[in-house]
């Protein structure tokens, strides 16, 4: 199958680019070597914490630790100086949880005597003994994407069923090593049922969780009795029970994924019944249960993701029935409520951070700005990215702020963090410096309807675009045809067929135009595999520049020219 990939122009180049990145380690602009372990970021505007108004200071880093923050530091001769005069320094972001760099374990084979009503734990998705450490790859392109977005620490979740395993906390630093701060941190849990076997329903998942928890409590009692009393039969402990002991003894929390109001209620009900430590994660729809969350005392990690507004933009204003109008109103109300939920958590005084699971790194900053535009304060947004998750994860002594003795995790941006034109120029993770290209942006920005501010000219997106993508191995390209149907963008894209037989075509999915930025996805099938390719670029007149990204392979520059504008629908 590798030969088949390498026959293809675009996919072959992507694979070549992927392989060239496998030795990636960045502390100089080329990312190939670390030239020093001592850095001085001089005269930057430093925000030490979410409540800090910011002031000019120098940050001195040595061996991955912040050794000083101030205005009168003595810099060692070996320090590499990063001029920070026009830069703004913030603590590196912390993902309360995520799946970056995590691979899926192999499915267990069903035994010949398999009984669907009583399957083995591993087949039923009950694998609390698994550790995220064993499935993490530091060199994954997902890790780089999130680091580029400003994230320097993440708790990672193992993939799997209702009890997939134990989480780990790691630093997104040296790509050549797995930089774990803590292992076996918490038990990941969710309401994911099993297909074709017990537990096959949400109620069944709850019952099974109780069963596993209570049987482990009985085993602990049995072990205590065996240790203190003669004549007692030796307890037989299963791998599941052994892994659950720390949870039952309240040494480890349960990190429960609960996206909906119903799942949140169920997770809190289980916690009240059984008494384990609870952290709620993956929250999406929670406006109606905020009081319940607050009364439970559980910290929360909300999804760093907002609903797509396409359904709102596609609503028609003419020729629709009253029932349809009412439905439109309900959809719009639900959408607007979702945008305000984070602000409601802040108002309620609930400690919350962010979960990056299922979110896109490229959309993080726009998501944060949208939350702020809908009532979340900038201070609370920064706290949810730094000090709050540090507290929730129990790592506030080493991360979350820019102070002497903390891990050297920080971002350097071109302006204050939540301004529209702000970009991240450097990320320091575990003392490793990662440099990123700063793109020049026009002062005239686009609006949601494709109009340019201060101008009556519309951004032209419909038509045929000829594109090329550059990778370390060369270039490849094709045509992008964009059409608009009832206000919704769509179309097709051509690319080099992985089979080596000329060009192939695929429909464009999830297309959107935000300001001047056009983004969309398409699927490439080859050798039984399906790859999701994301293209995102900024349009200026009849040209577009951006990136073509493929999970596990990386991101590559892409350029396009509009050759046939205003294609008729």
What are these regions (language model features)?
Residues 139-142, 147-285, 423-424, 429, ...:
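Polyanionic/metal-chelating signatures
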Residues 28-32, 37, 46, 50-92, ...:
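Histidine-rich, glycine-flanked metal-binding segment
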Residues 459-539, 545-566:
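Central antiparallel beta-sheet cores of small beta-barrel/beta-sandwich binding domains
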Residues 26, 36, 343-347, 353, ...:
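Extracellular/periplasmic ectodomains of large secreted or surface enzymes and adhesion receptors
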Residues 231-335, 352-353, 391-393, 399, ...:
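Active-site core of metal-dependent hydrolases
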Residues 43, 105-106, 112-121, 253, ...:
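His/Asp/Glu-enriched, well-ordered alpha-helical/loop segment
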Residues 28-33, 46-58, 70-71, 377-385, ...:
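Acidic, glycine-enriched loop/beta-strand segments at the rims
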């Amino acid at each position: 199958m590798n030969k088949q990939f390498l026959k293809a122009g675009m996919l072959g180049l992507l694979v070549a680019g992927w392989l060239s990145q496998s030795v990636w380690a960045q502390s100089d602009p080329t990312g190939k070597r670390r030239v020093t372990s001592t850095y001085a970021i001089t005269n930057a505007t430093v925000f030490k914490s979410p409540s800090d108004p910011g002031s000019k200071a120098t940050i001195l880093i040595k061996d991955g630790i912040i050794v000083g923050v101030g205005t009168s530091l003595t810099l060692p001769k070996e320090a590499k100086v990063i001029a920070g005069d026009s830069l703004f320094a913030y603590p590196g972001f912390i993902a309360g949880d995520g799946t970056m760099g995590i691979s899926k374990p192999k499915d267990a084979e069903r035994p010949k005597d398999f009984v669907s009503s009583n399957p083995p734990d591993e087949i039923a998705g009950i694998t609390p003994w698994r550790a995220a450490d064993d499935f993490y790859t530091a060199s994954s392109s997902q890790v780089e994407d999130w680091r580029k977005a400003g994230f320097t620490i993440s708790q990672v979740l193992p993939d799997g069923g209702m009890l997939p395993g134990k989480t780990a906390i790691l630093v997104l630093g040296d790509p050549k090593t797995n930089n774990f701060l803590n292992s076996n941190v918490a038990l990941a849990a969710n309401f994911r049922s099993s297909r074709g076997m017990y537990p096959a329903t949400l109620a069944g998942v709850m019952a099974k969780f109780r069963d596993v928890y209570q049987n482990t409590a009985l085993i602990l009692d049995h072990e205590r009795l065996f240790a203190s009393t003669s004549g007692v039969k030796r307890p037989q402990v299963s791998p599941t029970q052994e892994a659950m002991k720390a949870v039952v003894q309240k040494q480890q929390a349960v990190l429960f994924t609960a996206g909906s109001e119903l799942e949140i209620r169920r997770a809190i009900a289980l916690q009240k019944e059984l008494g384990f430590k609870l952290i709620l994660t993956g929250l999406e729809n929670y406006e109606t249960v905020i009081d319940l969350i607050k009364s439970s005392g559980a910290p929360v990690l909300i999804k760093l993701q907002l609903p797509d507004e396409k359904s709102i933009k596609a609503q028609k204003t003419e020729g629709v029935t009253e029932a349809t109008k009412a439905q439109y109103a309900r959809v719009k109300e639900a959408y607007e409520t979702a945008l305000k939920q984070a602000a409601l958590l802040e108002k309620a005084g609930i400690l919350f951070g962010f979960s990056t699971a299922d979110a896109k790194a490229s959309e993080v900053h726009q998501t944060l700005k949208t939350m702020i535009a809908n009532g979340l304060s900038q201070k609370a947004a920064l706290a949810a990215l730094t000090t709050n998750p540090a507290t929730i994860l129990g790592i506030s002594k080493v991360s979350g702020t820019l102070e002497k003795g903390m891990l050297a995790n920080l971002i350097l941006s071109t302006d204050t963090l939540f301004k529209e034109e702000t970009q991240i120029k450097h990320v320091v993770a575990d003392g490793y410096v990662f440099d990123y290209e700063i793109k020049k942006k026009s002062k005239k920005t686009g609006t949601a309807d494709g109009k340019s501010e201060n101008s009556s000219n519309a951004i032209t997106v419909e038509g045929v675009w000829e594109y090329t993508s550059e990778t370390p191995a060369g270039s490849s390209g094709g045509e992008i045809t964009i059409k608009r149907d009832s206000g919704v963008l769509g179309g097709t894209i051509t690319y080099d067929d992985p089979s080596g037989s000329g060009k192939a075509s695929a429909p464009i999915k999830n297309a959107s135009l935000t300001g001047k930025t056009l983004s969309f996805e398409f699927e490439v099938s080859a050798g039984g595999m399906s790859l999701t390719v994301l293209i995102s670029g900024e349009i200026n007149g009849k040209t577009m520049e951006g990136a073509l990204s493929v999970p596990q392979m990386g991101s590559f520059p892409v350029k396009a020219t509009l050759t046939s504008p205003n294609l008729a629908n």
